[in-house]
């Protein structure tokens, strides 16, 4: 583990040096900002272990260095944000550890006609086991470091004849516990005709991923092409071709997770800023869907509406190898309010979202309902005998746990996200809600994740601000199986921020977390009080 951590730290340093070196050649023509700061954070928690009973309080002291840097020039944009923190735990110094996070991106124009070198680096501390604790952080000392690096080339052209947005890159993901690791090529291309088209219009959308890990590989490909004739009327005919394939050495080879079809449709130009595409599609060959049934003809429909540069709506309905498929993308922005709603369905692999049920032990528990695991511990003087009529009524009870394992399967992911921000003169209100449904295409087991949060921030003086955070998180794992479990997290937080001067600030926060679970051993409460000082330079 230590060797792995050193290796990841070394990669982080090399990536940062490489990005800084690339941008250094352009410093003479750009604007460079460098903002370092020192952070001291003291957090008291009354239940650091996040357990139902025998809670242990702890004072978690964090000291770290934060660096935020931005470089902007005509041909280059570079952003770098990093924080290194060392945490000490008063209840158990064996947990003392250092934590690192990095978020960096580089865009360097190599050629005036749209060739751009791109690179990103992201290092974050995520929950070690999402099923055990979805809200794990540094204070709970139950996180794992996950690093993702990506570098490649973009080619973008936007003129009156045609529009092309394309990219090809190499992506590598490494985690501290080796779960969810992958590396491989990622490519995409989107193209459509320009405004000067008079006879033919087209749309091209293609994405491709080829990932591998531990001798296994997965290829994910999806393509859609529309080619039509421009007429003097508001109705224009077009041909549509669609192809999707997910292959490799993953999952169950007997299941079909591909679809291929062609069709004929019309584009109705409802107005200059909105059009509707409708096509009737015929499957190619005798391919089967994921349930083993022959794929049938279907109708594909898509609508696009853009009344202004600040408002855009796209929606579609179609059919893929698993049945009906939907997509939705809406964004709107004005002086005060920003809204964004996105719904998408995609196939993934090599993630940190695959769980299996393991029995971690057997305990003697009362025959009646068990509220805590402590009730399963028999006193030293107690004697259990099934032949004794005075037996207290104990039984052998298995303790089960959902364990995070390698995601060597394809999964269908349906994600809905809604983000809304209201900016008033002295108050900012943000609302976010997300819903993620994951279907294991091998076992057909479903998991769901729902999260909703409300943040209100109010400026009470020139240097002071108060805030209120309310969040609700719900996870449902192994749905419709004997091991199904639902966890609900309710968190409330109040904070006060004070800027003492231009480089020194003080934050005080009080929070309360309540978790309820179908497995009572995971039900707990936690209260925190934290104070943080940030000194900039």
Language-model segments: which ranges?
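Gram-negative bacterial Sec-dependent N-terminal signal peptides
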Residues: 1-31, 537
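Gram-negative and organellar
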Residues: 28-537
């Amino acid at each position: 583990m230590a060797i792995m951590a050193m290796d990841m730290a070394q990669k982080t340093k090399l990536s940062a040096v490489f990005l800084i070196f690339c941008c250094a050649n352009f410093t003479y023509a750009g604007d460079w900002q460098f903002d370092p700061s020192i952070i001291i954070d003291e957090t008291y928690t009354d239940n650091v272990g996040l357990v139902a009973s025998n809670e242990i309080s702890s004072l978690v002291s964090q000291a770290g260095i934060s660096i935020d840097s931005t470089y902007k020039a005509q041909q280059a944009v570079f952003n770098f944000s990093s924080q290194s923190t060392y945490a000490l735990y008063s209840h158990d110094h064996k947990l003392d550890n250092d934590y690192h996070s990095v978020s960096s991106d580089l865009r360097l124009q190599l050629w005036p006609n749209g060739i751009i070198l791109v690179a990103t680096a992201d290092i974050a501390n995520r929950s070690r086991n999402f099923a055990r604790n979805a809200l794990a952080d540094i204070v709970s000392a139950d996180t794992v470091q996950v690093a993702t690096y990506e570098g490649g080339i973009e080619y973008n052209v936007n003129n009156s004849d045609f529009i092309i947005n394309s990219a090809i890159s190499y992506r590598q993901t490494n985690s501290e516990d080796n779960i969810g690791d992958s590396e491989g090529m990622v490519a995409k291309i989107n193209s459509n005709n320009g405004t000067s088209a008079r006879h033919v219009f087209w749309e091209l959308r293609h994405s491709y991923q080829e990932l591998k890990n531990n001798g296994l590989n997965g290829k994910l490909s999806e393509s859609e092409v529309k080619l039509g004739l421009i007429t003097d009327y508001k109705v224009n005919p077009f041909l549509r071709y669609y192809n999707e394939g997910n292959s490799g050495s993953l999952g169950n080879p007997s299941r079909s997770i591909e679809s291929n079809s062609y069709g004929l449709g019309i584009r109705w130009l409802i107005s200059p800023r909105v059009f509707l595409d409708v096509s009737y599609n015929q499957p190619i060959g005798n391919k089967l869907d994921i349930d083993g049934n022959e794929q049938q003809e279907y109708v594909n429909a898509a609508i696009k509406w853009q009344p202004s540069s600040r408002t855009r709506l796209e929606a579609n309905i179609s059919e893929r190898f698993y049945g009906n498929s939907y997509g939705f993308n809406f964004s709107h922005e004005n002086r005060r309010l920003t809204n964004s709603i996105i719904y998408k369905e995609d196939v993934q692999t090599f993630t940190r979202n695959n769980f299996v049920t393991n029995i971690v032990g057997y305990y003697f528990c009362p025959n009646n309902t068990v509220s805590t695991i402590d009730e399963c511990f028999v006193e030293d003087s107690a004697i259990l005998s099934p032949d004794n009529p005075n037996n207290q009524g104990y039984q052998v009870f298995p303790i089960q746990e959902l364990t995070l394992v390698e995601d060597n399967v394809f999964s269908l992911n349906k994600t809905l996200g809604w983000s809304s921000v209201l900016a008033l003169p002295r108050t900012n209100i943000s609302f976010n809600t997300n819903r993620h449904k994951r279907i294991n295409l091998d076992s057909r087991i479903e998991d769901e994740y729902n999260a909703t949060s409300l943040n209100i921030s109010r400026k009470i003086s020139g240097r002071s601000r108060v805030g209120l955070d309310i969040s609700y998180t719900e996870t449902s794992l192994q749905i419709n199986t004997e091991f199904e479990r639902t966890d609900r997290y309710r968190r409330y937080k109040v904070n006060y921020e004070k800027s003492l001067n231009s480089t020194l600030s003080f934050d005080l926060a009080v929070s309360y977390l309540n978790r309820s679970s179908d497995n009572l051993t995971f039900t707990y409460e936690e209260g925190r009080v934290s104070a943080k000082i940030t000194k900039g330079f």
